[in-house]
């Protein structure tokens, strides 16, 4: 098999192709290609149909033909055989070559110009929007404060409404203004002072001697509350439960409770601080206790 020849056809090849077409007709391209070394049947067919056939129009395409090709291509796409049937004497290959070499460039050029124009306009719009947004984002905000240009550390701040002119003799004066933050100080509620009368038990008890001054009553009440917390709370409960009708029985119980608490307290005081009792009588024995109230005083060393 001879090597395939690529490139333009020579005059000798064209003459040989015409003779073979007259001999075999414009159909048997395989037999025709055997008489032309290096050319395939397809190459012979294209050369004949596009260039050498007497039916092919070699005149330039008219503007009417160009308009027909452009309209048909917009409708049919790249179906060149279908488009060529709309033109007398034009082959599909001729129409395709004319489109690729001339019409496509013209149409794409016009479209390209329009597209570029629109694209430039579209590109300008975002740029304008970006520039506006950039300017607005970084525009100086009037905060009502004025920074001193002559301050070494730039900390001096003053009200912009009182900015002195550079030529003013008071241009060196700056009034620092505090900047209020986003914090709200909630005042603490004042403690509610409860009267001692609402917390005192219905029955007032005291360890002081009869005839003692009333000035030490509040102090004694506080000491009693500290010394006998269990007794005080339990006494309140008993008063509420028993009522006024059984007051006599309740007082007996209260006296027994007081004796027990005093004994416990005195025993603890003797162990810790070495205190002693003055003004009271103590009964010894299994049922011993304090018959009368006395004053507890610390031992003086």
From Swiss-Prot:
| UniProt biased composition (Low complexity) | 155-167, 195-224
Region described as Disordered: 145-167, 190-225
Q: Which locations, inside or outside the cell, does it occupy?
A: Nucleus
Its signal peptide is: none
Q: Which UniProt keywords apply?
A: DNA-binding, Nucleus, Repeat, Transcription, Transcription regulation
Presence of the UniProt keyword DNA damage in the record: no
Disrupted gene: phenotype observed = No visible phenotype under normal growth conditions.
GO cellular component, alphabetical, reads:
nucleus
SUPFAM superfamilies to which the protein is assigned, alphabetical: Homeodomain-like (SSF46689)
Family annotation (InterPro entries): Homeodomain-like_sf (IPR009057), Myb_dom (IPR017930), MYB_TF (IPR050560), SANT/Myb (IPR001005)
Gene Ontology molecular function, alphabetical: DNA-binding transcription factor activity; transcription cis-regulatory region binding
Instruction: Kindly give the Pfam families that the UniProt entry links to this protein.
Output: Myb_DNA-binding
Enumerate the spans annotated as HTH myb-type domain: 1-56, 58-107
Q: What induces it?
A: Induced by auxin. Down-regulated by potassium deprivation.
Q: What GO biological process, any one, is recorded here?
A: positive regulation of auxin mediated signaling pathway
DNA bind region: 29-52, 80-103
**In which tissues or organs does this protein occur?**
Expressed in roots, stems and flowers. Expressed in dry seeds. Expressed in root vasculature, root tips and lateral root.
- PROSITE patterns, sorted: HTH_MYB (PS51294)
Cited function: Transcription factor involved in auxin response. Functions in auxin signal transduction and modulates lateral root growth. Interacts with ARF response factors to promote auxin-responsive gene expression. In response to auxin, binds sequence-specific motifs in the promoter of the auxin-responsive gene IAA19, and activates IAA19 transcription. The IAA19 transcription activation by MYB77 is enhanced by direct interaction between MYB77 and PYL8.
Q: What does the record note on quaternary structure?
A: Interacts with ARF1, ARF7 and IAA19. Interacts with PYL8.
Additional remarks:
Plants overexpressing MYB77 exhibit stunted roots and shoots.
Name of the molecule in the record: Transcription factor MYB77
Organism in which the protein naturally occurs: Arabidopsis thaliana
């Amino acid at each position: 098999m001879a090597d395939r020849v690529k490139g333009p056809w020579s005059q000798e090849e064209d003459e040989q192709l015409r003779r073979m077409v007259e001999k075999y007709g414009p159909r048997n391209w395989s037999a025709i290609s055997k008489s032309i070394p290096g050319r395939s049947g397809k190459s012979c067919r294209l050369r004949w149909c596009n260039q050498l056939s007497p039916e092919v129009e070699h005149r330039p395409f008219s503007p009417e033909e160009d308009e027909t090709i452009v309209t048909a291509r917009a409708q049919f796409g790249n179906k060149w055989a279908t488009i060529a049937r709309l033109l007398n004497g034009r082959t599909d290959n001729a129409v395709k070559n004319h489109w690729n070499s001339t019409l496509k460039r013209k149409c794409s050029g016009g479209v390209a110009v329009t597209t570029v124009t629109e694209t430039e306009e579209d590109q300008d719009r975002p740029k304008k929007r970006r520039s506006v947004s950039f300017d607005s984002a970084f525009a100086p905000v009037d905060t009502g404060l004025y920074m001193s240009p002559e301050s070494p550390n730039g900390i001096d701040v003053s009200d912009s409404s009182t900015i002195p002119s550079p030529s003013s003799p008071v241009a060196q004066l700056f009034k620092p203004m505090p900047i209020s933050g986003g914090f709200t100080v909630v005042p603490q509620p004042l403690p509610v002072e409860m009267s001692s009368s609402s917390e005192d038990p219905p029955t007032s008890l005291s360890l002081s001697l009869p005839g003692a001054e009333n000035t030490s009553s509040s102090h004694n009440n506080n000491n009693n509350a500290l010394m006998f917390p269990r007794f005080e709370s339990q006494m309140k409960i008993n008063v509420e439960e028993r009522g006024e009708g059984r007051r006599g029985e309740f007082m007996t119980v209260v006296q027994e409770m007081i004796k027990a608490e005093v004994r416990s307290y005195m025993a603890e005081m003797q162990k810790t601080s070495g205190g002693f009792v003055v003004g009271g009588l103590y009964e010894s024995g299994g049922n011993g206790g304090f018959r009368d109230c006395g004053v507890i005083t610390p031992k003086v060393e």
